């Protein structure tokens, strides 16, 4: 049996392919379309001319693909990654409010029919390889347009200096990134003799070969059949049989690591391996520095290169792994116990798939679930077919090619913040923007979670009735700050600006009920569910490339968002659970003050980094009456930000802040972080205009003639070490900051 081939074109579409600047084949970008079906976003390549004519490209399609949005009068820019999209030029903004309106004029063109906005959610460089390996081992033909554009994207993200790939698009090369992306390229048909592959292979060998990859790399390579399972540290499904009261049982772990461990443990127990074929036989020769048969894989379970070892395994975890290998597996892992563990693990996989209609929590666990379904249900089963369809929800097309998003989108998150930006900037009552905001409200209404999942306790899910998810209701996981921002956006439109009451008061109360259930005894809020275990579980962190992943931690951003939303709710509904809301806010504010550092900063876990957290923290303190003039905490937060302002008036923070846990200046000011810092200072009622005025001038100077801002450095982060893109941030945060400045200081002429 061989792996999944690249599918054939349905028509003569191969004739659409043309060489790109690197000599790689490229599809005809005028044939790509994004379909947004009630928040489910999938890309489609129209092979026939008839299809192409019936479904014209939208402005949003062209923007995402880096195409000009009207016929350019001048030759198109050669570097489409940073090129200006040729919407008509707008009158040059002279005031902050004009600049905000020009930005909104551009950004409004990108709203999709259901009312949401879309974007890539890229950055991590380990997602596509898991997908490609899944396609291969489940004999799933890869659509030819996917293969063509995935190849282009991976080569576009190869480091030109050393030929490798990193954990994310701005990271240094590592074994994880280099090995996995090399394998992905080989599986989609790239020759080992391609000069770029030779360079990548040379770097991998310099690192010591694939045996020096982290745990997740070794897992995927073993599934593919190019590494032996003896090289993978144990992932026993028996842990799922432990009573719930045990302090280290998996239900206590952070949701993402739990959902990855689930199918990983099932496949590890089954020792599923794709049968050897000519290509995987070749890969066995290419990935190592010595003959495959001479490698003692069992001796390399703990081998890892320093470039990958962000969070080294503890002595305790190494001891546990050794005991599992030497004692548990050979002497105590009896067949009856294994059968029970595999059956229960499979039941949990099945519930996750059914609760999300096979969309899954995220792009790491979902391909693993598909392999588990392939093994358990068979290649032609409904579960495998549905997974194949749902994996398309994670794919994204851009000018560089096709990537895999970090979730199945950012729909609710972006739409809520865009709504708030327009309100804060003062545009919500303008009849021009009312249809757009009404559509956004319709989208938020559609994606509020109206009921809990079946068997909630059995599958360890958090209460979700009344919540909003990060992406869409199909994925359907409660997220505390998404719930807070959805609640806040709804109240702003319905209560403050008389938009249609699409979401009833009872449903707003459901949202508040959900938020109150998510607070931890510490006063803080996690993102997906309350904290279920001790921080000591971090001693069992086996991922090596990520930190802070074993439990759901309190996050300043989630806590502050919840405080701000609850404060707004109580303004309009002061009698609903008033004492409980006050108590929750009091505890949360104490947490926010407690985690402020001596220098006045807060560490942000979902955006870069101290700038991001300061914006949320200072706004939440202001919502309870603590501002620059009245609160030492707010004052110190403002002074910290002011100490980081650059000469040009902007702020720029490197992603290294997230890794190193100290503020690291970016070499350039960044539009997004400048907006964050300004919003933080203005919400805290910082009284001096001069620093803010300088920042406004920078934001205005970076705006393009059509109203957009260009992509700069990466904006988001997760697990301390992996960065992720939020490209819509460069639109709505500056719009919000510019509009708020004009409201606070007057719409003065600055340019």
From Swiss-Prot:
Catalytic residues as annotated in Swiss-Prot or TrEMBL: 481 (proton donor)
Record EC number: 5.4.99.7
Gene3D superfamilies, sorted: 1.50.10.20, 6.20.120.20
Reactions catalysed, as given in the entry: (S)-2,3-epoxysqualene = lanosterol
Entry GO MF terms: lanosterol synthase activity
Chief place of localization: other
Acetylation as UniProt keyword: no
Enzyme class label: isomerase
Domain of life: Eukaryota
Keywords: Endoplasmic reticulum, Isomerase, Lipid biosynthesis, Lipid droplet, Lipid metabolism, Membrane, Repeat, Steroid biosynthesis, Steroid metabolism, Sterol biosynthesis, Sterol metabolism
An annotated GO cellular component: endoplasmic reticulum membrane
Pathway where it operates: Steroid metabolism; ergosterol biosynthesis
GO biological process: ergosterol biosynthetic process; triterpenoid biosynthetic process
Subcellular location: Lipid droplet; Endoplasmic reticulum membrane
Topology in the lipid bilayer: Peripheral membrane protein
PFTB repeats: 147-189, 508-553, 585-625, 634-675
Family per similarity comment: Belongs to the terpene cyclase/mutase family.
PANTHER family in alphabetical order: TERPENE CYCLASE/MUTASE FAMILY MEMBER, TERPENE CYCLASE_MUTASE FAMILY MEMBER
Function: Lanosterol synthase; part of the third module of ergosterol biosynthesis pathway that includes the late steps of the pathway. ERG7A and ERG7B catalyze the cyclization of (S)-2,3 oxidosqualene to lanosterol, a reaction that forms the sterol core. The third module or late pathway involves the ergosterol synthesis itself through consecutive reactions that mainly occur in the endoplasmic reticulum (ER) membrane. Firstly, the squalene synthase erg9 catalyzes the condensation of 2 farnesyl pyrophosphate moieties to form squalene, which is the precursor of all steroids.
Name of the protein described by the UniProt record: Lanosterol synthase erg7A
Naturally occurring in which organism (per UniProt): Aspergillus fumigatus (strain ATCC MYA-4609 / CBS 101355 / FGSC A1100 / Af293) (Neosartorya fumigata)
Gene giving rise to this polypeptide: erg7A
């Amino acid at each position: 049996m061989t792996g999944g081939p690249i599918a054939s074109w349905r028509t003569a579409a191969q004739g659409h392919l043309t060489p790109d600047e690197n000599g790689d084949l490229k599809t005809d970008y005028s044939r790509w379309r994004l379909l947004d079906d009630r928040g489910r976003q999938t890309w489609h390549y129209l092979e026939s001319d008839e299809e192409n004519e019936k479904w014209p490209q939208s402005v949003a399609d062209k923007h995402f693909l880096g195409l000009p949005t009207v016929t350019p009068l001048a030759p198109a820019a050669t570097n489409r990654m940073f090129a200006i999209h040729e919407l008509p030029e707008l009158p040059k903004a002279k005031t902050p409010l004009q600049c905000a309106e020009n930005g909104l004029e551009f950004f409004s063109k990108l709203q999709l029919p259901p009312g949401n906005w879309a974007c890539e959610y890229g950055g991590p460089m380990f997602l596509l390889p898991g997908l490609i390996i899944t396609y291969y081992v489940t004999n799933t033909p890869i659509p030819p347009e996917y293969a063509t554009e995935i190849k282009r994207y991976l080569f576009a993200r190869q480091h030109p200096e050393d030929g490798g790939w990193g954990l994310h698009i701005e990271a240094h090369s590592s074994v994880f990134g280099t090995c996995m992306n090399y394998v992905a390229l080989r599986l989609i048909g790239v020759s080992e003799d391609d000069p770029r592959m030779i360079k990548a292979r040379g770097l991998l060998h310099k690192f010591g070969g694939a045996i020096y990859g982290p745990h997740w790399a070794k897992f995927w390579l073993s599934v593919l059949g190019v590494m032996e399972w003896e090289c993978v540290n144990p992932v026993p499904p028996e842990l799922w049989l432990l009573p719930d009261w045990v302090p280290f049982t998996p239900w206590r772990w952070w949701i993402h690591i739990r959902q990855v461990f689930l199918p990983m443990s099932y496949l590890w127990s089954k020792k599923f391996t794709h049968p050897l074929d000519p290509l995987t036989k070749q890969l066995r020769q290419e990935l190592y520095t010595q003959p495959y048969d001479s490698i003692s894989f069992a001796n390399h379970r703990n081998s890892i290169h320093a470039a990958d070892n962000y969070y080294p395994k503890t002595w305790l975890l190494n001891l546990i792994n050794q005991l599992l290998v030497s004692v548990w597996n050979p002497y105590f892992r009896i067949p009856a116990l294994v059968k029970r563990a595999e059956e229960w693990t499979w039941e949990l996989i099945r519930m996750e798939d059914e609760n999300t209609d096979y969309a899954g929590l995220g792009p790491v666990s979902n391909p693993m679930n598909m392999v588990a379904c392939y093994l358990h249900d068979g290649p032609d089963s409904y579960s495998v077919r549905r997974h194949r369809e749902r994996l398309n929800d994670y794919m994204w097309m851009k000018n560089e090619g096709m990537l895999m998003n970090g979730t199945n989108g950012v729909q609710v998150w972006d739409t809520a913040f865009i709504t708030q930006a327009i309100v804060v900037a003062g545009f919500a009552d303008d009849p021009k923007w009312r249809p757009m905001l009404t559509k956004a409200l319709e989208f938020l209404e559609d994606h509020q979670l109206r009921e809990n999942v079946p068997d909630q306790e059995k599958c360890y899910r958090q209460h979700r009735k009344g919540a909003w998810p990060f992406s869409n209701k199909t994925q359907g996981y409660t997220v505390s700050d998404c719930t807070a921002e959805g609640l806040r956006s709804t109240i702003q439109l319905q209560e403050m600006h008389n938009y249609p009451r699409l979401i009833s008061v009872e449903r707003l109360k459901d949202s508040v009920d959900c938020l109150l259930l998510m607070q931890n005894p510490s006063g803080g809020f996690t993102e997906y569910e309350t904290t279920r275990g001790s921080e000591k579980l971090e001693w069992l962190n086996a991922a090596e490339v990520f930190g802070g992943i074993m439990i759901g931690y309190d996050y300043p951003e989630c806590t502050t968002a919840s405080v701000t939303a609850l404060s707004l709710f109580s303004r309009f509904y002061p009698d609903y659970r008033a004492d409980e809301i006050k108590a929750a806010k009091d505890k949360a504010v104490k947490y926010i003050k407690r985690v402020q550092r001596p220098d006045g900063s807060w560490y942000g876990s979902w955006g870069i980094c101290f700038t991001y957290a300061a914006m949320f923290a200072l706004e939440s303190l202001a919502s309870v009456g603590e501002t620059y003039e009245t609160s030492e905490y707010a004052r110190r937060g403002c002074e910290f930000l002011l100490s980081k302002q650059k000469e040009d008036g902007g702020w720029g923070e490197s992603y290294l802040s997230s890794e190193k846990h100290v503020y690291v200046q970016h070499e350039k000011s960044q539009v997004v972080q400048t907006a964050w810092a300004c919003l933080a200072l203005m919400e805290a009622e910082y009284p001096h205009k001069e620093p803010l005025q300088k920042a406004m001038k920078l934001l205005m100077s970076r705006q393009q003639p059509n109203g957009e801002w260009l992509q700069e450095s990466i904006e988001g982060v997760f697990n301390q070490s992996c960065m992720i893109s939020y490209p819509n941030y460069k639109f709505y945060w500056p719009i919000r900051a510019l509009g708020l400045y004009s409201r606070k200081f007057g719409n003065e002429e600055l340019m």
